[in-house]
């Protein structure tokens, strides 16, 4: 007997991803930042997170799997704790790409780029800028007095909510992608949706380039005397 965790969530539309696959993605999101580097930042961590699910989606299509793995090695940078949300949406779009020859695969990276900025803004401010500071404050105030509860409370206050958030993001990201994108495609609005995502993605990458890339030239433009 097949358990609910082994039943494809979007089976009615030909999907193959199960809840067990998403739970596995959740666990594989934990080392997201282990391979961070300046060129593409978290792209290898993102690939590691969704890799097994991609192999399942393109099980009988080696060339499609190769393209999907290459496609998802593009630049990626987002608060690690909410990255499974983007991973879930990406898997939903990869399933659509696998089933529909007319689907524009480049839109997958456009949607990823469009989501990185807004989710990072929320994640950095709430998780790293608020929850982490709160956990450090409580933990440190006890630790300086020699109370063993200091590091324990820091560990629990910061990690329990973020673990739950990662899990919820993995599940809800895929469900949103599977349900919403199928409806958008059926309504004929997919092209407009992808155009909007591409424009937003270019804006996000442009803003990040402005912040991260520094170029100096010998040419100086003066004003006045």
What are these regions (language model features)?
Residues 1-104:
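Soluble N-terminal domains of membrane-associated systems
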Residues 28-33, 70-75, 107-120, 182-187:
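Cytosolic juxtamembrane amphipathic/interface segments immediately preceding
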Residues 76, 125-129, 159:
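The structured alpha-helical core of multi-pass membrane proteins
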Residues 106-141:
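Transmembrane alpha-helical segments and their cytosolic interface motifs
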């Amino acid at each position: 007997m097949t358990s609910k965790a082994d039943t494809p969530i979007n089976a009615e539309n030909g999907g193959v991803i199960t809840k067990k696959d998403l739970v596995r993605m959740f666990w594989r999101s934990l080392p997201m930042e282990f391979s961070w580097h300046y060129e593409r930042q978290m792209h290898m961590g993102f690939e590691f997170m969704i890799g097994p699910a991609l192999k399942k989606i393109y099980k009988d299509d080696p060339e499609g799997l190769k393209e999907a793995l290459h496609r998802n090695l593009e630049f990626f940078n987002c608060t690690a704790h909410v990255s499974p949300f983007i991973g879930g949406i990406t898997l939903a779009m990869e399933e659509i790409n696998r089933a529909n020859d007319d689907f524009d695969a480049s839109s997958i990276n456009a949607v990823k780029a469009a989501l990185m900025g807004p989710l990072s803004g929320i994640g950095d401010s709430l998780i790293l800028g608020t929850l982490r500071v709160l956990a450090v404050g409580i933990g440190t105030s006890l630790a300086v007095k020699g109370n063993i509860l200091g590091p324990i409370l820091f560990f629990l206050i910061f990690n329990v909510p973020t673990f739950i958030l990662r899990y919820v993001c993995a599940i809800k990201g895929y469900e949103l992608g599977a349900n919403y994108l199928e409806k958008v495609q059926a309504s004929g609005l997919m092209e407009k949706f992808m155009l909007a995502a591409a424009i937003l993605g270019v804006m996000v990458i442009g803003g990040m380039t402005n912040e991260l890339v520094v170029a100096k030239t010998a040419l100086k433009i003066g004003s006045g005397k």
